[in-house]
């Protein structure tokens, strides 16, 4: 048994990894900022100690896992080196963990967390599968055969992994503080492709993914009949989305997903293909798919009188489009109200016009102040720059959430990667409801 200390344990990936190591019988603790983050609920439920940052947390005999947001000058990392302890960064450590399993990496600019959550749930319907999801959920199952995990492209962290399979959902320009342009992102994915040992499952309609070369087979999925696996005869029902699946041009089976939206069909196709390649029992897969309840902060719904409140991580124009599309398909008779908090000044500046265009697809738009990352300070851009580009958009904060009460028959989308949940929480509390995210 190893004693692990996670520096930045409330980070979504770090929280998941800490839970996995705890489940596998190791002694685990960690440190982070003294502020509530939704990831800590799962940690506390498993009895994992969360400490405020302090060099005294670091003791002899520990192995230190260093979160991506923390440099070698962090006080706890400095103390670890003074004690001559082993310090391993998050992606390197995760790369070591996956080596003992048949591993499936899920990567892409959008859809990683939802697809990883679906993959882990569905595979566990037939085979023991440990998993690491980017919503702060992790589970280490003893004697697992498979390991499903989210692999982030930011700063090329995913190059630390050599998975058996990779699901590549899409390539898009994001993280403008690191990547120069979409070609730079594509080059990173190309490097990742050469790390894959068995096969790549990629969205066939993505022009950038179509350029990827690999030393293993690439299987394309989509809604077009020229793909290796595709969906046809799509029907939206009160229970979800039903569709037929074809593999190599031949009818495979009919599936029912409890989710809505084309992006969720695509995610499901990718998962089905991986299961098919590994020979999992199709009836078990179908049954597990029908019971998938989603992942944290991905279209999580709460009913409030005649309103549906949705908590969603969407923080890129393309993700906002998908979230609004899902709301319209699932609730065609309700207004769609967008409450959005931009995440990072660099992303807001890079996609200012695209944010305005995507948000304008909602019936009404409310915007929160920009949530800056710990790495940046940029006063040259304000939320007013985005408000001015969206007709009728208004500023919203915890002190004026009651304005949302006027939308009686509506889906209210609270979107963002920062602390947008405080706005939804304030609105619910003002309506006499408490909710712990």
From Swiss-Prot:
It comes from the Bacteria. Pathway: Cell wall biogenesis; peptidoglycan biosynthesis. One of its GO terms (biological process) is cell wall organization. Its EC number is 6.3.2.8. One of its GO terms (cellular component) is cytoplasm. GO terms for molecular function: ATP binding; UDP-N-acetylmuramate-L-alanine ligase activity. It catalyses: UDP-N-acetyl-alpha-D-muramate + L-alanine + ATP = UDP-N-acetyl-alpha-D-muramoyl-L-alanine + ADP + phosphate + H(+). ATP binds at residues 108-114. Belongs to the MurCDEF family. Cell wall formation. This is UDP-N-acetylmuramate--L-alanine ligase. The gene is murC.
